[in-house]
């Protein structure tokens, strides 16, 4: 068990470095393929001033540093929670340190990991937003930037809201499906913590997107300041909950959700101030919530029905997830929460439109 944990830690540490190395090699390959064209463009260039390597390095540093600091502050959230719960809390309550570390391992290794999966999709979309928003603002096309931001926020909510509901409703079977070597007690704790964290999926998705939008608008320091404020609020909340309640590890889950919610509100407010932007409410938030509620009810009913017959969580949860996704897709279109044009902007959007038209959901 110790060796497996060690290899897991080594793998997670190596994964980050290998990912960056592969990206660097990919960029080098792209440059090698386009080197001839780049050199020809350089020869045709008529600019007399050429930046020195020092100036180029300084410019890159000034651009990249805020992104690095922002990521560092984001990661501090988990570090602070870890320190509070595993180092300060045991001395406060005179608790066994080994038990505390085991419980926090369940929180960070299972519940938090599962809640981060949907957020990864929002992060990918957020990365794609920076150049497009920056381009529109450079062209002084504020209206175009607002439309782009509005569509990105709506797309993020259409994906993250059902993910949050799905994780809440199917927390235990999903955890059991992916973590097969855990005891029933560990699975129950991980599932309960995942349910507590499910709301943070929506908050993190929106705050991550808005953070990238702000960076695309040139407000590179704003997300860092907002993350710092949210970190202070989270720390105070975690300490107070651990001191004055018996919520134990749930205090950390609640504080984590509060952190993401605070980030979401502050970043959204900053984007609104920067471009005078107001998000449409009904189709972006209300309809996805109602469609997700129907989806959640269907997922729970199908899972419980299949579990009564099969007595297997793993066999029951997969059909429940698939049918729940279909129910959400149908309800979202029937409630007119998404247009054909918006649906085409999704990954495999043209295929989704084709399926919807075949099923007569779209005309």
Positions of PLM-derived features:
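Membrane-interface helix-loop junctions in multi-pass transport and translocation proteins
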Residues: 1-25, 29-30, 221, 231-265, ...
């Amino acid at each position: 068990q110790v060796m497996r944990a060690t290899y897991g830690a080594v793998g997670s540490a190596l994964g980050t470095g290998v990912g960056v190395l592969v990206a660097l090699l990919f960029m080098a390959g792209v440059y090698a393929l386009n080197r001839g064209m780049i050199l020809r463009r350089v020869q045709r260039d008529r600019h007399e001033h050429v930046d020195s390597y020092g100036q180029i390095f300084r410019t890159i540093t000034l651009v990249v540093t805020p992104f690095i600091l922002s990521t560092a502050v984001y990661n501090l959230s988990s570090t602070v929670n870890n320190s509070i719960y595993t180092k300060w809390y045991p001395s406060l309550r005179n608790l066994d340190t080994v038990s505390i570390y085991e419980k926090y391992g369940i929180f960070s290794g299972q519940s938090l990991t599962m809640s981060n999966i949907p957020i990864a999709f929002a992060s990918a979309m957020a990365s794609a937003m920076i150049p497009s928003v920056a381009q529109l603002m450079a062209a002084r096309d504020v209206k175009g930037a607002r439309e782009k931001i509005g569509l990105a926020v709506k797309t993020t909510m259409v994906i993250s809201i059902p993910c949050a509901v799905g994780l809440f409703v199917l927390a235990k079977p999903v955890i059991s499906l992916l973590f097969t070597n855990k005891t029933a007690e560990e699975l129950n704790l991980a599932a309960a913590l995942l349910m507590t964290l499910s709301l943070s999926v929506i908050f993190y998705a929106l705050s991550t997107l808005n953070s990238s939008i702000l960076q695309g608008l040139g407000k590179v320091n704003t997300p860092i300041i907002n993350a710092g404020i949210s970190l202070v609020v989270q720390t105070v909340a975690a300490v107070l909950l651990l001191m004055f309640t018996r919520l134990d590890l749930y205090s950390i889950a609640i504080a984590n959700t509060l952190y993401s919610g605070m980030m979401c509100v502050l970043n959204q407010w900053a984007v609104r101030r920067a471009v005078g932007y107001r998000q449409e409410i009904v189709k972006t938030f209300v309809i996805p919530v109602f469609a997700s509620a129907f989806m959640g009810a269907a997922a729970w009913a199908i899972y419980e029905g299949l579990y009564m017959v099969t007595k297997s969580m793993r066999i029951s949860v997969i059909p429940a997830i698939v049918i729940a996704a279909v129910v959400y897709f149908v309800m979202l279109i029937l409630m007119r929460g998404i247009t054909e044009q918006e649906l085409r902007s999704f990954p495999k959007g043209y295929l989704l439109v084709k399926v919807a038209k075949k099923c007569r959901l779209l005309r």
